[in-house]
């Protein structure tokens, strides 16, 4: 493995020859060559775009979960307040309206 890494450093000037003979091995051993090879650049763009898409998808899920949690937490607070203070039922209604606005 060490000998091959030394060879890959000397083969930087011969990128085309290196891709035809050992394209996969260079991708695993030499990280610097990934930026030089156009194939690795395309793979990097795909992976980067995919990670960015995952971030957007997760953010949508998180916003949806946060909205659900707020709604559930408001219901729990309303139930607790109603059980604890039966006279102040109007306060629960105002809390409902506030939660719907958010």
Curated annotation (Swiss-Prot):
Residues 1-102 are annotated as: Disordered. One of its GO terms (cellular component) is nucleosome. It is found in: Nucleus; Chromosome. Proteolytic processing into mature chains is required for histone eviction during spermatogenesis. Transition proteins (TNP1 and TNP2) are required for processing. GO terms for biological process: chromosome condensation; nucleus organization; spermatid development; spermatogenesis. Keywords: Chromosome, Developmental protein, Differentiation, DNA condensation, DNA-binding, Nucleosome core, Nucleus, Phosphoprotein, Spermatogenesis. The keyword Disulfide bond does not apply. The keyword Ribonucleoprotein does not apply. The modification Phosphoserine is found at residues 8, 10. InterPro entries: PRM2. Testis. It holds the Pfam family Protamine_P2. One of its GO terms (molecular function) is DNA binding. Residues 49-102 have a biased composition (Basic residues). Residues 8-17, 39-48 have a biased composition (Basic and acidic residues). It comes from the Eukaryota. Residues 18-29 have a biased composition (Low complexity). Belongs to the protamine P2 family. Interacts with TDRP. Protamines substitute for histones in the chromatin of sperm during the haploid phase of spermatogenesis. They compact sperm DNA into a highly condensed, stable and inactive complex. This is Protamine-2. It comes from Macaca mulatta (Rhesus macaque). The gene is PRM2.
């Amino acid at each position: 493995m060490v000998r091959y890494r030394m060879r890959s450093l000397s083969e930087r000037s011969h990128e085309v020859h290196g891709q035809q003979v050992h394209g996969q091995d260079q991708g695993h051993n030499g990280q610097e060559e990934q930026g030089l090879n156009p194939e690795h650049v395309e793979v990097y763009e795909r992976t980067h775009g995919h990670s960015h898409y995952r971030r957007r998808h997760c953010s949508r899920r998180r916003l949806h979960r946060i909205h659900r949690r707020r709604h559930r937490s408001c219901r729990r607070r309303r139930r607790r307040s109603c059980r604890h203070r039966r006279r102040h039922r109007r306060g629960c209604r105002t809390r409902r309206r506030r939660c719907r606005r958010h």
